[in-house]
Amino acid sequence: MAPTELATLTSYPDAGYNHSGWLSDDGNTYAMQDENHGYDVKLLDVSDFNNISVISTFNSGMNAQCMAHNGIIKGDLLYLAYYHDGLRIFDISDPSTPTQVSSYDTYSPTSYNSYKGAWGVYPNLPSGNIIVSDMQSGLYILDCTNPINSIENINSN
């Protein structure tokens, strides 16, 4: 049996190479990243498939050419591997006004026109630690038991 299309969103701000996304635990908010330099992260209201809409757009605020990759929502927090800008954590408890609450730089950028730096993030370890993979500098295990206050590098090689 072939899949049945339930909905589409083909027109939205900074439409590009829609590379990755993650659905919130309640199934109402979807965070998506178009893997293009300078394109914002989008938070979508997907509570009604007949009326999918962009709630907000935002970025790391570091550079006009920054690029988000492979975000994961856990509770009210969106964890983003942000290439040159490292790990970025946003509070999305109010999806209309996401707020960056923490960050950890894994890569010193020299140019934003390449795919270098933090590529993946995984915040779902039982310990509460976060794993961040950086294509140039390796694997980071970060203590993120309270991401709003601080992140500590436990081990990196």
Task: Name each model feature, range by range.
Residues 1-150:
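Feature marking well-ordered beta-strand scaffolds used for ligand recognition
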Residues 152-157:
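Surface-exposed, proline-anchored Ser/Thr-rich loop/turn motifs
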